């Protein structure tokens, strides 16, 4: 049993909760997720099973797309709807569509962002949320992130009321805190704000419409069709360029054999396959020997090579 499961993460569960539940359903210990989603967030959560856990790091660096909602009028401790109210300032004027779109535009491109106190970012070996729960404030590291697209989804021309909400879609780099973006939008418009809803619609090439629920996974287990829920390792890595090696080279790859970059591939990672179209390893460019590739992650062992 191996591959990537595209889970439609439900609301109210942490990513670790999802891994724990999937271990029980599949009766498989080797399971890991490819990036944390907050409990209130739903949507695409790729989970690696069996040998696929070795490729998790190559699936976490992808861009992510979210659809969410910002609410102006009050901010919270967690920057989303689950936290306690920190500041209230009713929206006492009409907000125009142009104002919102201009705010989103200023947050598009390469920007700096400070992670929220209620996050898993570590400072001095301790997670920020641990400081927050103890009532301690610490200096947080500023991150550089990339916002590829930030668009308003509401079709209204004006927004008015004591608490204004509007929907958006954002495509961003790994490590972006979308709830912090919601706070930044409010700051641009002059009001406290928080993220009131969020769903991840894409993680790299993995899309929400291709995800399955826990109920569907359990149904496949009961029906004996569990293999159908997996994306193969080969398919999950299909975005990387591919090299094919002969049988003798395949046997040496498990021991860390270097390879010549005969195809002159410039991409940072290269997948290496045997003649049977089985992915053996992921290689990268050797930093000291131009034209050579070195293994970054070997996916097979002695026993598997003999199969």
From Swiss-Prot:
InterPro entries, alphabetized: PsdUridine_synth_cat_dom_sf, PsdUridine_synth_N, tRNA_psdUridine_synth_TruB, TruB_C
EC number(s) given by UniProt: 5.4.99.25
Keywords assigned: Isomerase, tRNA processing
GO molecular function, one term: tRNA pseudouridine(55) synthase activity
EC class: isomerase
Lineage, opening ranks: Bacteria, Bacillati, Bacillota, Bacilli, Bacillales
Family affiliation: Belongs to the pseudouridine synthase TruB family. Type 1 subfamily.
Gene Ontology biological-process entries: mRNA pseudouridine synthesis; tRNA pseudouridine synthesis
Function: Responsible for synthesis of pseudouridine from uracil-55 in the psi GC loop of transfer RNAs.
Keyword tRNA processing listed: yes
UniProt xrefs under HAMAP family: TruB_bact
Keyword hit for Signal: no
Catalytic activity: uridine(55) in tRNA = pseudouridine(55) in tRNA
Location of the active site: 38 (nucleophile)
Domain of life: Bacteria
Protein name, entry field: tRNA pseudouridine synthase B
NCBIfam families (alphabetical): TruB
Matching Gene3D superfamilies: Pseudouridine synthase
């Amino acid at each position: 049993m191996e591959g990537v499961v595209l889970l439609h993460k439900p609301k109210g569960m942490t990513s670790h909760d999802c891994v724990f539940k999937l271990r029980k359903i599949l009766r498989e210990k080797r399971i890991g997720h490819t990036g944390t989603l907050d409990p209130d967030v739903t949507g695409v959560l790729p989970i690696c099973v069996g040998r696929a856990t070795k490729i998790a790091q190559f699936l976490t660096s992808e861009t992510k797309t979210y659809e969410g909602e910002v609410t102006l009028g009050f901010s919270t401790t967690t920057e989303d709807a689950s936290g306690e109210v920190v500041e209230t300032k009713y929206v006492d004027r009409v907000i125009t569509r142009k104002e919102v779109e201009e705010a989103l535009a200023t947050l598009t491109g390469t920007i700096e962002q400070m992670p929220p106190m209620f996050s898993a970012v570590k400072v001095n070996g301790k997670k920020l949320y641990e400081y927050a729960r103890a009532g301690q404030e610490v200096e947080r590291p500023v991150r550089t992130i990339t916002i590829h697209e930030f668009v308003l989804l509401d079709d209204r021309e004006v927004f008015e009321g004591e608490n204004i909400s509007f929907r958006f879609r954002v495509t961003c780099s790994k490590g972006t805190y979308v709830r912090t973006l919601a706070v930044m939008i409010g700051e641009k418009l002059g009001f406290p704000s928080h993220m009131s809803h969020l769903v991840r619609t894409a993680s790299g090439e993995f899309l929400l419409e291709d995800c399955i629920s826990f109920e569907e996974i359990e149904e496949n287990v009961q029906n004996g069709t569990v293999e159908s829920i997996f994306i193969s390792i080969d398919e999950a890595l299909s975005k990387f360029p591919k090299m094919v090696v002969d049988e003798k080279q395949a046997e040496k790859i498990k021991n860390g054999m270097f390879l010549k970059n005969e195809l002159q591939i410039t991409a940072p990672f290269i997948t290496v396959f045997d003649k049977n179209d089985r992915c053996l390893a992921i290689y990268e460019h050797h930093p000291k020997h131009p034209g050579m590739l070195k293994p970054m992650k070997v996916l097979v062992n002695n026993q598997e090579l003999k199969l």
